[in-house]
C-alpha cells in the first residue's frame, strides 16, 4: 500500500492551494492507494472527507498537524491517542523554519515515527531525520507535505498490506513495517537509503 501521509487542503490550511477532489485525482493518477489530510491545527475536514471517501470508494484518512512546544507533530486517530492507540509522527524535524523538533526528538516520549522524507524539506535535513529515526528505533515515514499540485505524492509511505479504515490504518502503522518511497516520474521506489 502506498499512502501520502501529509497533505494540506485549502479549506482549513489557508496556505494550501489544493482542494480535496484535486488531491484525490492526482493521488490516483500516481497510483497511491490512500491519502492523509493533515491540516494545520484542525480536523475540520473530517466529516466531508469521510463522506467523499465513501462516495468514491477511496481511503482518505484525516489526521492533524499540530504545533507543539518544540515543533510540529502529525497524528492520526487523535481520539485514540488519549487511549495510547493513536499514531504520532515528528514531521520535518530538521527543517530550518523552526517548526521541527530537531534534537528534541530524543525528549518527546510516545512518538511512533519520524518523517524521514518530507517533500518540502532539503535532502540533507531529511537525511538527518533518518539518522535520528534509526537511533530512536521509530517508524520511517515518507510524506509530501503538499500545498500545491506538483508536490502531491512526491514522497509517500509504503505498507505491506492495504487497509481502508482509519482504525485499521492506525493499527497497520503500529504493527507493520513502514518504508519511505520516492516518486520517480512513472512510479515509486521504496527506499532505505537516500
Ranges and model annotations:
Residues 1-5, 9, 13, 19-26, ...:
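Charged catalytic cores and adjacent phosphate/nucleic-acid-binding surfaces used
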Residues 86-87, 116:
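Short helix-capping and hinge/turn segments at secondary-structure transitions, especially at repeat
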Amino acid at each position: 500500500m502506498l499512502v501520502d501521509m501529509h497533505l494540506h487542503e485549502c479549506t482549513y490550511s489557508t496556505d494550501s492551494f489544493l482542494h480535496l477532489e484535486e488531491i484525490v485525482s492526482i493521488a490516483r493518477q500516481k497510483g497511491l492507494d490512500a491519502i492523509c489530510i493533515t491540516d494545520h491545527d484542525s480536523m475540520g475536514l473530517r466529516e466531508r472527507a469521510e463522506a467523499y471517501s465513501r462516495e468514491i470508494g477511496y481511503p482518505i484518512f484525516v489526521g492533524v498537524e499540530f504545533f507543539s512546544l518544540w515543533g510540529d507533530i502529525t497524528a492520526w486517530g487523535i481520539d485514540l491517542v488519549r487511549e495510547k492507540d493513536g499514531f504520532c509522527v515528528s514531521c520535518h524535524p530538521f527543517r530550518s523554519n523552526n517548526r521541527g523538533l530537531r534534537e528534541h526528538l530524543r525528549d518527546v516520549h510516545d512518538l511512533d515515527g519520524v518523517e524521514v522524507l518530507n517533500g518540502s524539506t532539503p535532502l540533507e535535513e531529511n537525511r538527518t531525520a533518518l539518522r535520528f529515526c534509526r537511533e530512536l528505533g521509530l517508524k520511517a515515514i515518507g510524506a509530501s507535505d503538499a500545498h500545491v499540485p506538483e508536490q502531491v505524492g512526491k514522497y509517500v509511505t509504503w505498507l505491506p498490506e492495504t487497509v481502508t479504515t482509519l482504525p485499521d490504518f492506525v493499527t497497520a502503522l503500529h504493527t507493520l513495517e513502514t518504508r519511505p518511497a520516492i516518486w520517480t516520474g512513472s512510479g515509486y521506489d521504496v527506499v532505505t537509503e537516500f
